[in-house]
Each structure stands twice: as C-alpha cells, then as structure tokens.
C-alpha cells in the first residue's frame, strides 16, 4: 500500500500522476470532522493511491454474477464428472464441440504420418490416393470446375472397401456420418429420402463447427439397385435415387421436407460403396455427379493387408506371403476368417473344462468377467490346414445346390446322396461312440473298399 499526503489551503489538492505511478488508482477522500459535519473547502484533504495487483482480480465466485463460461471447453472439462447419461460419446456425432480454427488440445496436437498405414494396418496407396483427393477437392474452391460430390467405390465382395475407407477416415481425422443399405427402404414412403437429407445436414452441421466430415453409405446398390427381375422397385428406391441426384446437383442447398430455408449449408462429400453399380439408376452414376473407382487389390495390396491381420500373432512376413499365394482367388476377408478359425481349438478346450450345462452362466451376466484365452500359436501349417477347410466349405456350397434340386423335382429319399458320392457319409464320427461299429475302408474309389464297413479306419489303399 502506497500513499501520498499533501495539505493545501484555499486551493484543491493536486498530486502529479507520475508520482503515483501508472498502476496506481487515485482515490480522493474528503475528511469528516469529529462532529459528523461535512468538510468545507479549506479543510485538510487526504489523497491515497492503492497499488492494484492483477492477481486480486481473479475472483473464483465471479461466475455467479457474470457469465464467464466457455461452452466449448466446458464439454471437455465435464468428461468424467457429469453423469454419462448426459454426455455424448467423445468423437461421435454433432455433440463433439469443436473450436472454429483448431481442435482441442487432446486432438489439436495430434500428428499424422504421411504413410499408408494407420494403427498398424495397411492402406492401399491407390485407394488412399483416390479417397483423399476426392475429399480434399470437395472442400476446396476451385475456379470454374464442377467437382463430383459422390465417390462410388465398387468391386468384389470381401475386398476391404469399407475397412479401407474407415482407415483413411481415421487417418484424416474424419468422423463420417454412417448409413447402410438397410436404411434405404421403409414401410413409409419417403422416409429413406428424408433420412438421407437429415444425415447430410447433420454432417454439414459438423463442418460448420469446424470439423471435417462426410456422409458414408455402405452397399448402396443393395438398397437402391435392382437385383434381377425378382426385385421389386419401390417408390422409396426412386426417391433415394432422386434425392442423391438432387443433392449432387445442389450440395449447398439441401432442405428437409416441409420447410425451406434459403440459408446455405456447407458442402458435404458423399462416399458410397457397392458391388455392382450397373444396378443403379444410370443418371445417378453419370460422371458429373459420381466419380467411380473400381477397387481390385493387387498381390502387394493383399500381402500388405494380411500383414496387418496377423501382426499380433508373430507370423513372419515370409509365412504371410506363402499363405496369400496359396489362396490367390480368395477375398481379403477370407484371411480374417482364417485367423478366427484358429481360436476354435481354444474355445473347444474351454467348453470341455467348463461343461456344456454351465456355458450360459459363465458367458452371460457373469461375475467373473469376460473369458480370456492365451494367444494360440499360429504356424504356417495350421493356417494352411484351416484355409483348405474353409475352401472345402466354399466348394460344398457351390457344388451342392439343393435349391435347384428341390425346385426341379420331388427329391425324396435323397437327403444323403451327395455325402455318399463323396465318401464322407460314414466318416469317423461313429468311432466316438461306445457301440461296436464295423470299421474298414469306406471310400468307394479305394482298392480295398469294404461295403460292410460303417466307420472309416484310415486303411484305404489307392492306385496312382
């Protein structure tokens, strides 16, 4: 506390402000006489200057009288404090508050590698290039250029189209608004078209908040295409095609049914996947509206993806290459199913130790928590064995077309015809029981075929 005193007679008190300092606040207080009467002009005057400390202005109760909150930051502060019932999941939907020019500290300091991997998973360079260029181009203002709003990625089944898209989205920091083919049909006419507009405007709302976003529709041809003459073409199919065409033509003027607002919305790129875009309405897939990309992974792409699938299983790169080359005609999801099949032995052991009658109590609402396994050892021999088993199941589906047989004739008494032809009807299952079963060679193509045998004992001899 610094103070300055001066006494004057017949003139008002004055003290140079330079003497008091720049941070000093001048306070003039008139002296009051001892009798409680006001002072006159010639009375003694006291002038005091108080040093203002900036720290004293931080009042923790200031928010009671003045609004000092920041809703954007409060959402982050409330995580873990506010009941989760009232908290949206982080990074999903329009509930994630985003600052206008940068993201929160937890996301704003994130650095991306400009390589074609994400989280240890491989992204095909051609796929990444097409998707990144399309998304970036739709957020740019290019002079006198009409940019297609929709990117259609199509190709064979199980080739990782959706998964590769998700990896690119994660690498770019995009949380897409998702839709599937099942949402493109409804019992109420016009509902799917309205839903597309709602999802599009939701993505536009996220872009307006400063968060890059897009609309991602899975398997568009399954919901809006015509799969042969037996597929009924409904009003909703027509409206879905017409809505996507309208959005592609006017991406900044997307209105909801029953209302019209001239205020423009941000442009939202649309990414769709499918297996055959020739089933779609031709004007929708024309070049000005949809940019098409046929995805057929090369051998290097398949090897790169499979290395990501087996990265936690200590499978060497040479083994992955051997597995991929052994099954050249299989889709990429075949190798994911192959890895999952290896865990069958562990599950079988767990069932034997737990007991079939106790499985429900152990797996559903158990106090012991989820079941955990030791990671099984994966060898090339075991993976190839399970791979051939999967291929055999595929061949069975293609060979045994029972629907054609049942539709063409009354196939009664022929339920096991295919199994008898292939020699797998008797098999080795009968040996697991306690009843005496005659064993022998049950393969009709073997030299020592025994027609009386009802269980194969592995003694078949062949002439090559």
From Swiss-Prot:
GO terms for cellular component: chloroplast stroma; thylakoid. It is found in: Plastid, Chloroplast stroma. Residues 1-48 form a transit peptide. GO terms for molecular function: ATP binding; ATP hydrolysis activity; ribulose-1,5-bisphosphate carboxylase/oxygenase activator activity. Disulfide bonds: none annotated. InterPro entries: ATPase_AAA_core, P-loop_NTPase, RCA-like, RuBisCO_activase_AAA_helical. It holds the Pfam family RuBisCO_activase_AAA_helical. Changing residue 316 to C: In strain: cv. Glen. SUPFAM superfamilies: P-loop containing nucleoside triphosphate hydrolases. Keywords: ATP-binding, Chloroplast, Nucleotide-binding, Plastid, Transit peptide. Belongs to the RuBisCO activase family. Activation of RuBisCO (ribulose-1,5-bisphosphate carboxylase/oxygenase; EC 4.1.1.39) involves the ATP-dependent carboxylation of the epsilon-amino group of lysine leading to a carbamate structure. This is Ribulose bisphosphate carboxylase/oxygenase activase A, chloroplastic. It comes from Hordeum vulgare (Barley).
